[in-house]
């Protein structure tokens, strides 16, 4: 931006002249182009305004492409070796096949390289993005820069992206590596991800489309983009195509088809052409309506006159070309363009160099553009193809041909055809009037009537044909001519050059690129054009530099200093925060800034400044009798009256220049004399009125000149007044800053006082003034001034914030009338209070508008006292420094600080240069390492998990009778489908080990099995099975210690090989006889429930008992091996063996203990008989042994013996005893122990009550109580009325009111509290604390408990507590002051109590347990959801037979189920329930609607079912929003199903009318899950309703669940919920665990409680902070092992403080960021938001946990949102740990 532009008027009612601007970017000539009047006109031409490309041959821009074309470059070469390496390793045959596959073509050297950090993409995500996405993203950015569009400015715009794509090599590479598939790979490798990634990164709101039309894809994309623009669907289009050759598959296909040349070269039109060379790269063009482009000052590169797309229909083969189709599509494009074929000068052909394709295409093009067009033989049409230069880019080929055609039109030349030696003899070149150039050809000179035109053809092997017609822009030559008239390097006017980068380390490279370009083009460029390009048409990133330069050599030298990080006074640098700085505020300072030649330079060189001076000259002449112009030219005398007037003139003149460069201010303030200019610039006065005030007052000052003096003293105004005391003749005139003020008064008095204070060590500096400004000595001038101004001033309301330094309230809106200026003259200047108000209002950027800075230091000091935020205070001019450069430097400082200067609006017609260097990329390799073995080869070396054994690759050991099986075991290939945890470690079930033995041996018999050490699944380990004719052994070792010599191999299990002729002891069992002698019928779930009770939380296999009978020593169970058809099992045997070992361990259920099998005497299987899915398992105790030993037999349903497991012995695990482990660790209730009281109570200077009812009788009592304690208070009906800025220690107490309707009470109170929090956070009032008072008895207020807990988690800095009080007329000050960090406090017996989870105690036997009767009906809301259907299935297995499933959605008519909806999973679930014997009614009733209760009653009467005995309310929706974002609509939508639904059920089924009333709530509210404000409120209401019904004698209970694995919130695809659970200190549970917990609660009658909290606390690390206080009594942790001399990070042993602590924390936090994002620590920018570095929601949770475990301090769920950068986090933890 240049300081020499002409003037602009202030944004005020000031008088002035119109702006004078430089000429606009040409675009005025539209001859030959249709410019429609209507935006939606379908006839509109489309302009190409930007292009970018990256191709082989090191082509990285259209300019470098043109140079490459001119030299007939051929970029063909060999495939980089690493590309196909994963395929070479996948199969032994692949190496030979790849050797036969063409490995030559046109390749990018750095296809794996990408600048992920620039786009804030984490390395983890970057490597999962197809290189095509990365390439397209970078090239699209370059194309926008080439178009002169700053990409960030498109955010939210109707900009579309159309990208052609046809290759999915990377997707195949990644997605076929199944064990390593990751969530990011979906969009990361999809075709749609290529345009969508661009739209996402740039925040574009227009269409985003990927097109696959094979090799025509990118030209088809351009066609659709053009159509969308013409139809008005989009304003701007990014169109192009991309191709990457990463796998051998398609190359092999094309080899087989004979389409590829053996040497990988393209030879279009050449006799030797025998196929094409595949190529990779990307091309992008930017399209806009021509009329809009001209209006926006864009450079029109060419006009896209017409385009067409078609198909070649049915040919000899789908890949065979069709000349007629190619001809027709060309004619269609010409018709669209409305130009004749003979006007086309050049055709860019598809020309794939195939023997059939080239002649076919050339003949078709000749028919259209050659001889068939009727053109003269002397005017042939030139034809060419870019493919021999850069290869056939397939999906990117069309757009690259288009870019070449645009370059041909712009240069008026056709480059020579590469790789053309002998013309193809199959083409009639002598007759067709098409000419492929051998040398550079210059096209005929175009004219306005006959502009140059070109056509582009592109075809796909699938049959798509496309064509485009281009025309040279008629204004191009005019533009070039006018650009040449712009002054170049010798223009002396200074300019501002802006460079920036998203990270600090990039700035040097950006500066280096610009320096090199300037050096190479010094003689031909205009520095002004470079300035406007950088300011208006480039993105402005976080790290900013601004250079003030007045010549190209000056700029080059400054850029060199930037590159070297050398100091330079005209180089400004800064980094901005994540949001734009608020401001700027212009400060007009007062008397004292003057110097003799202060305005001379500006008057001579700035038209804007000169205009101000000439406007003021007549007034100054008339009013004070001297010439301002003459004074500027000769020098300003040191006379107070002249200084006053000239200072005002300088203020307005500098402001005029500054507004041209940086735009208008956001606010203004004047200091003393400066208030006059502030009034003018704000619009409160015209410039004439401002001049009258200053001139007439200056004239009066002449009476007092020489009678006064002023001195700056380094003490505060308050101290100065105390020191002055009763001394006369001296007053405090200016309150400048907290440590300084200005004294004014009589000359002698000032001198005496100054001398005395200096002797006392106080700094005193005399001010250049001989008038006693701002003292009572001026009172005699008051009346004359008032009279002289009365009637002359007509003050207005300012048009921007105007602060006062004359009024006690700096925000006073008093009009600037005559009385105001009297006050301004006499009263002290309150600069300090005005600056404090500016800081309080959030302004952080301030500019001192003066000829020399005199208040900057004071302003910096005051701002520093008011805020810890970064602050900018900059001068506009400095004495004896170049004025224009100084003002530009101020603009540069504002920009670098982060003020949003709209440069393009300041000078919209400024010329610009697209050749200015674009973004410099900092590439790093990102390429996903995949498993280099195929699925088949993996099976050769590892076990098959679905075989449910550990047999890997079989190796016969030569020279021995031994056989070895070896495998690699890890979590991903565990040989069982479920989970089998033991003390937190996943172990291989004994059944799998036994099956492994049986599978390895030919005689299916093993004996003397010893199960010695469990085989642990994770971490990964090697497993070997060795056997000979006598023994078989399983051994294992961790992968990292797998050498045989180091003794790390464990013997896990051994056995002897059984004899070949061993058979079961019996062939058949009489099952009917067994049933008769086993009289005790057990529940089908008996074994599972028992095992759960002793600590087995999950099963390795999905077997299920369907019939179970027993006696004291014997059991018979009918078992289904796989009732739900779970995958992961090739047969049923191992699942049934697992059932056998599990069920037989329950024979000793009367002595409960977790028992594991330790040995087996013999296992024998009848291998001739296939194992059915359903078997009977017979277990009997072996009485002759002291151990727990059983014999087990598996039989078919007819009694045929299938297997015997004889003498299986069990032993209890060391330290295990019966304690109902599973449910005691799972089922809890909330108890309320006394709260700990702090020693340093909170102090409140004021308490503000907020309540809808200000007549609430409690208020009078509370205020009386506070009056007695001398604490002030106030009452407010709305949060917006709170006095947040008036008190430093404010307590806000919300008193919710009760309304007639319970739902209205709940929603109103929650909305009120949300509004309070939003108001306080918006005001950034961190010293305010919020409390809520309830009596705990009002049902509608119970929702507030859940909301309060979420607020505590999200805003712990302002949350006090929700307090349930006993005495509603006594303010609970003790709890408010002495209990800290509590979300909810309950006062009972006068004691503040806090919530803690404790195990649910057993209840008395008199309570009714939960039972399901076949004769009753049960109702489930949310019944068609996954949770509801799972509950329904469990209830049916427990005896329920009649179910009502309520849901908001209706199922299709049952008559259509069998035909159309058999794959509907909901319908399948219902049919499964019916197969189990249940009658299911699905009722489409939205239970939250007002009429739901009556509708449900009516439906129940109609169905005529047995009475409803139990209700489960499981309906609900989730809409996560932070409290700051919650709206009333969202809150009500989430609360309705929970609260209205529950109340409707409460109405239909009143208390004591049911066997049970179960409400599904959530534990998320207790643990403060962020974002769940609405959901938590609804769930807390359910808890309150259960409490209310229980109080009325009902068997109601609220179950506060953790997530159910795989259901509801437990289905988070990206693992966010699992990570959040872990962060909060708990885990999810399986549905089986949920039902066992429910059964446990029901079996105790709920323990007499109205709720049960069903969670499992995870085991914490030794030094890990407790994730939430509510877990205090149930959390367990591992012992912390610390080596001697070591201390945990963040522990009190590390005695650091100050800068040492800050550096330690920065290192720790950077390490955690590095670990989370997989980024190097030296690449982390501590000022960049972690989200902008690519940290998503799941990573954020993991980062919090890493941080918490490293620092050993709690890290709240919203801390990362409030402290978004490393810088913020360091500051936060420094304060916390220092405290």
From Swiss-Prot:
The protein's name: 6-methylsalicylic acid synthase
Entry EC no(s): 2.3.1.165
Biotechnological relevance of this protein: Yanuthone D is an antibiotic against C.albicans, methicillin-resistant S.aureus (MRSA), and vancomycin-resistant Enterococcus.
Annotated segments matching region Product template (PT) domain: 942-1218
Domain remark from Swiss-Prot or TrEMBL: Multidomain protein; including a starter unit:ACP transacylase (SAT) that selects the starter unit; a ketosynthase (KS) that catalyzes repeated decarboxylative condensation to elongate the polyketide backbone; a malonyl-CoA:ACP transacylase (MAT) that selects and transfers the extender unit malonyl-CoA; a product template (PT) domain that controls the immediate cyclization regioselectivity of the reactive polyketide backbone; and an acyl-carrier protein (ACP) that serves as the tether of the growing and completed polyketide via its phosphopantetheinyl arm.
UniProt KW keywords: Methyltransferase, Multifunctional enzyme, Phosphopantetheine, Phosphoprotein, Transferase
Compositional bias per record (Polar residues), positions renumbered to this chain: 1-11
Domain Carrier: 1703-1777
Gene Ontology process terms (BP): fatty acid biosynthetic process; methylation; secondary metabolite biosynthetic process; terpenoid biosynthetic process
Annotated Ketosynthase family 3 (KS3) domain residues: 43-472
Region (N-terminal hotdog fold): 948-1064
Annotated source species: Aspergillus niger (strain ATCC 1015 / CBS 113.46 / FGSC A1144 / LSHB Ac4 / NCTC 3858a / NRRL 328 / USDA 3528.7)
Record-linked InterPro entries: Ac_transferase_dom_sf, ACP-like_sf, Acyl_transferase_dom, Acyl_Trfase/lysoPLipase, Ketoacyl_synth_AS, Ketoacyl_synth_C, Ketoacyl_synth_N, Malonyl_transacylase_ACP-bd
PANTHER family according to UniProt: FATTY ACID SYNTHASE, SYNTHASE, PUTATIVE (JCVI)-RELATED
Compositionally biased tracts (Basic and acidic residues): 31-40
UniProt region (Malonyl-CoA:ACP transacylase (MAT) domain), positions on chain: 586-883
Limits of the PKS/mFAS DH domain: 948-1219
Observed phenotype of the null mutant: Loses the ability to produce yanuthones D and E.
O-(pantetheine 4'-phosphoryl)serine carried by residues: 1737
């Amino acid at each position: 931006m240049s300081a020499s532009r002409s003037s602009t008027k202030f944004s005020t009612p000031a008088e002035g002249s119109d702006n004078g601007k430089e000429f606009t970017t040409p675009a005025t000539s539209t001859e030959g182009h249709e410019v429609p009047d209507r935006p939606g006109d379908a006839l509109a031409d489309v302009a190409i305004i930007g292009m970018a490309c990256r191709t082989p041959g090191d082509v990285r821009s259209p300019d470098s492409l043109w140079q490459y074309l001119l030299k007939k470059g051929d970029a063909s070469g060999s495939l980089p070796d690493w590309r196909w390496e994963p395929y070479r390793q996948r199969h032994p045959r692949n190496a030979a096949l790849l050797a036969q596959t063409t490995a030559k073509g046109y390749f990018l050297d750095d296809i794996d390289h990408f600048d992920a950090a620039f786009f804030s993409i984490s390395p983890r995500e970057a490597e999962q993005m197809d290189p095509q996405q990365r390439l397209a993203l970078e090239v699209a950015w370059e194309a926008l820069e080439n178009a002169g569009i700053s990409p960030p400015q498109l955010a939210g715009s109707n900009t579309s992206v159309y990208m052609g794509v046809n290759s999915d090599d990377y997707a195949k590479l990644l997605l076929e590596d199944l064990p390593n598939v990751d969530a990011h790979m979906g969009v990361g490798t999809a075709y749609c991800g290529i345009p969508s990634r661009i739209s996402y990164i740039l925040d574009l709101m227009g269409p985003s489309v990927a097109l696959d039309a094979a090799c025509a894809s990118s030209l088809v994309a351009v066609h659709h983009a053009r159509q969308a623009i013409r139809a008005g669907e989009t304003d701007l289009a990014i169109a192009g195509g991309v191709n990457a050759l990463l796998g051998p598959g398609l190359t092999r296909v094309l080899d087989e088809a004979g389409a590829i040349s053996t040497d990988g070269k393209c030879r279009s039109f050449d006799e030797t052409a025998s196929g094409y060379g595949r190529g990779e790269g990307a091309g992008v063009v930017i399209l806009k309506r021509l009329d809009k482009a001209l209006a926006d000052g864009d450079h029109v590169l060419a006009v896209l006159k017409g385009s067409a797309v078609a198909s070649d229909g049915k040919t000899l083969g789908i890949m065979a070309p069709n000349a007629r189709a190619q001809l027709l599509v060309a004619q269609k494009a010409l018709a669209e363009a409305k130009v004749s074929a003979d006007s086309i000068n050049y055709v860019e052909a598809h020309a794939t160099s195939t023997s059939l394709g080239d002649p076919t295409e050339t003949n078709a093009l000749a028919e259209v553009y050659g001889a068939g067009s009727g053109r003269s033989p002397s005017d042939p049409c030139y034809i060419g193809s870019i493919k021999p230069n850069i290869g056939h880019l397939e999906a990117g080929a069309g757009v690259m041909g288009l870019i070449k055609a645009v370059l041909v039109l712009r240069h008026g030349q056709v480059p020579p055809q590469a790789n053309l030696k002998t013309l193809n003899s199959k083409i009639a070149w002598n007759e067709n009037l098409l000419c492929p150039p051998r040398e550079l050809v210059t096209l005929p000179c175009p004219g306005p009537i006959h502009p140059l035109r070109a056509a582009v053809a592109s075809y796909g092997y699938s049959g798509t044909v496309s064509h485009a017609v281009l025309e040279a822009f008629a204004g191009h030559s005019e533009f070039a001519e006018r650009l040449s008239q712009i002054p170049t390097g010798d223009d002396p006017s200074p300019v501002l050059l802006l460079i920036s980068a998203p990270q600090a380390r990039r700035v040097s490279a950006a500066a280096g690129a610009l320096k090199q370009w300037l050096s190479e083009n010094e003689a031909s460029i205009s520095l002004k054009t470079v300035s406007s390009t950088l300011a208006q048409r480039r993105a402005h990133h976080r790290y900013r530099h601004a250079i003030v330069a007045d010549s190209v050599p000056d700029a080059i030298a400054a850029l060199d200093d930037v590159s070297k990080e050398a100091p330079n006074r005209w180089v400004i640098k800064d980094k901005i925060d994540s949001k734009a700085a608020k401001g700027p505020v212009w400060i007009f300072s007062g008397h004292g800034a003057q110097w003799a030649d202060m305005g001379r330079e500006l008057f001579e060189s700035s038209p804007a400044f000169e205009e101000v001076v000439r406007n003021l000259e007549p007034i100054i002449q008339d009013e004070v009798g001297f010439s301002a112009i003459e004074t500027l030219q000769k020098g300003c005398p040191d006379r107070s009256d002249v200084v006053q007037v000239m200072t005002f003139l300088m203020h307005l003149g500098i402001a005029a220049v500054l507004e041209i460069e940086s735009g208008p201010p956001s606010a203004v303030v004047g200091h003393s004399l400066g208030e006059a200019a502030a009034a003018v610039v704000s619009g409160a006065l015209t410039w004439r009125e401002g001049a009258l005030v200053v001139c007439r007052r200056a004239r009066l000052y002449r009476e007092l000149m020489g009678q006064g003096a002023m001195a700056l003293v380094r003490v505060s105004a308050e101290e100065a007044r105390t020191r002055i005391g009763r001394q006369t003749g001296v007053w405090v005139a200016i309150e400048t800053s907290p440590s300084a003020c200005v004294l004014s008064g009589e000359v002698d008095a000032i001198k005496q006082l100054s001398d005395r204070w200096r002797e006392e060590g106080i700094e005193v500096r005399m001010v250049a003034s001989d008038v006693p400004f701002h003292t009572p000595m001026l009172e005699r001038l008051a009346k004359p001034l008032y009279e002289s101004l009365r009637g002359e001033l007509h003050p207005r309301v300012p048009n921007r914030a105007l602060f006062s330094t004359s009024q006690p309230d700096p925000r006073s809106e008093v009009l600037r009338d005559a009385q105001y200026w009297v006050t301004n003259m006499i009263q002290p200047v309150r600069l300090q209070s005005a600056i404090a108000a500016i800081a309080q209002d959030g302004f952080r950027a301030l500019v001192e508008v003066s000829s020399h800075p005199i208040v900057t230091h004071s302003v910096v000091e005051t701002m520093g006292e008011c805020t810890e935020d970064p602050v900018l205070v900059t001068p506009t001019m400095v004495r004896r420094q170049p004025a224009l450069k100084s003002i530009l430097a101020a603009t540069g400082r504002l920009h670098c600080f982060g003020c949003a200067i709209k440069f393009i609006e300041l000078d919209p017609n400024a010329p610009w240069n697209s050749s200015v260097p674009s973004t410099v990329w900092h590439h790093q390799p990102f390429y996903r390492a995949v498993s280099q073995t195929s699925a088949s080869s993996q099976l050769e070396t590892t076990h098959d998990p679905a075989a449910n054994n550990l047999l890997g690759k079989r190796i016969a050991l030569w020279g021995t009778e031994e056989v070895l099986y070896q495998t690699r075991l890890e979590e991903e290939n565990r040989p069982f489908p479920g989970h089998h945890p033991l003390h937190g470690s996943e172990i291989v079930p004994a059944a799998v080990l036994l099956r492994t033995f049986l599978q390895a041996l030919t005689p299916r018999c093993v004996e003397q099995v010893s199960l010695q050490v469990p085989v642990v699944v994770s971490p990964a380990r090697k497993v070997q099975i060795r056997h000979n004719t006598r023994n078989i052994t399983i051994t294992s070792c961790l992968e990292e210690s797998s050498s045989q010599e180091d003794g790390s191999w464990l013997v896990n299990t051994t056995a002897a090989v059984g004899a070949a002729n061993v058979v079961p002891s019996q062939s058949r069992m009489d099952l009917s006889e067994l049933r008769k002698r086993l009289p005790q019928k057990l529940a089908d779930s008996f074994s599972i429930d028992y095992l759960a009770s002793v600590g087995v939380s999950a099963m390795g296999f999905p077997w299920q008992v369907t019939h179970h009978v027993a006696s004291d020593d014997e059991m018979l169970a009918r078992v289904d091996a796989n009732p739900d058809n779970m995958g992961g099992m090739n047969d049923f045997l191992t699942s049934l063996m697992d059932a056998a070992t599990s069920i037989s361990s329950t024979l000793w259920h009367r002595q409960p203990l977790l028992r594991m099998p330790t040995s087996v005497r013999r296992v024998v299987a009848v291998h001739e008989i296939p194992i059915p899915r359903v078997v009977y398992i017979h277990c009997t105790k072996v009485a002759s042994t002291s151990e727990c030993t059983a014999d087990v037999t598996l039989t078919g349903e007819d009694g045929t013996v299938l297997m015997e497991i004889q003498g299986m012995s069990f032993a209890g695990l060391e330290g295990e005893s019966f304690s109902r482990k599973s449910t005691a660790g799972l089922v809890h209730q909330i108890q309320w122990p006394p709260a700990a009281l702090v020693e340093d109570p909170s102090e409140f200077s004021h308490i503000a009550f907020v309540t809808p009812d200000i007549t609430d009788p409690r208020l009078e009592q509370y205020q009386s109580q506070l009056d007695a304690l001398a604490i002030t208070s106030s009452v407010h009906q709305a949060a917006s009325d709170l006095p947040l800025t008036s008190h430093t220690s404010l307590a806000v107490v919300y008193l919710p009111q009760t309304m007639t309707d319970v739902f209205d009470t709940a929603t109103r109170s929650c909305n009120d509290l949300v509004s309070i929090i939003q108001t306080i956070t918006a005001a950034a009032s961190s010293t305010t604390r919020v409390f809520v008072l309830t009596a705990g008895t009002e049902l509608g207020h119970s929702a507030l408990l859940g909301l309060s807990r979420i607020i505590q988690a999200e805003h712990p800095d302002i949350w006090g507590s929700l307090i349930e009080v006993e005495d509603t007329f006594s303010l609970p000050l003790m709890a408010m002051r002495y209990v800290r960090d509590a979300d909810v406090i309950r006062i009972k017996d006068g004691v503040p109590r806090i919530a803690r989870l404790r195990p649910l105690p057993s209840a008395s036997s008199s309570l009714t347990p939960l039972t399901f009767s076949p004769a009753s009906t049960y109702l489930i809301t949310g019944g068609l959801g996954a949770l509801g259907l799972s509950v329904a299935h469990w209830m049916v297995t427990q005896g329920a037979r009649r179910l009502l499933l309520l849901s908001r959605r209706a199922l299709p008519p049952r008559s259509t189920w069998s035909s159309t909806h058999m794959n509907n999973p909901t319908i399948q679930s219902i049919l499964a329930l019916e197969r189990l014997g249940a009658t299911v009614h699905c009722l489409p009733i939205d239970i939250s609607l007002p009429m739901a209760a009556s509708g449900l009653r009516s439906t129940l009467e109609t169905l005529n079912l047995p009475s409803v005995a139990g209700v489960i309310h499981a309906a609900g929706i989730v809409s996560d929003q932070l409290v700051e974002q919650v709206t009333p609509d969202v809150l009500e939508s989430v609360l309705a199903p929970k609260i209205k639904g529950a109340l409707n059920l409460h109405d239909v089924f009143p208390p004591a009318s049911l066997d049970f009333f179960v409400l599904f709530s959530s534990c998320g509210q207790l643990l403060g899950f962020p974002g769940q404000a609405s959901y938590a409120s609804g769930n807390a209401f359910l808890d309150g309703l259960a409490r209310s019904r229980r109080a009325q004698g009902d068997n109601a209970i609220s179950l506060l669940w953790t997530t159910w694995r795989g259901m509801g919130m437990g289905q988070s695809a990206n693992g966010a919920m699992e990570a959040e659970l872990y962060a909060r200190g708990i885990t999810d549970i399986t549905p089986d665990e949920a039902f066992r917990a429910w059964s446990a609660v029901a079996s105790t009658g709920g323990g007499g409680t109205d709720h049960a909290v069903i969670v499992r606390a995870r085991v914490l690390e030794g030094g890990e902070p407790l994730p939430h206080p509510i877990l205090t009594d149930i959390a367990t942790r591992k012992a912390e092992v610390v080596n001697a001399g070591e201390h945990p990070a963040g522990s009190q042993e590390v005695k650091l403080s100050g800068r040492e602590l800050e550096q330690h924390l920065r290192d720790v936090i950077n390490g955690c960021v590095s670990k989370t994002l997989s980024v190097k620590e030296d690449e982390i920018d501590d000022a960049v938001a972690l989200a902008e570095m690519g940290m998503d929601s799941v990573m954020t949770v993991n980062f919090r946990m890493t941080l918490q475990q490293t620092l050993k301090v709690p890290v709240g769920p919203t801390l990362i949102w409030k402290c978004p950068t490393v810088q913020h986090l360091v500051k936060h933890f420094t304060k916390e740990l220092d405290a």
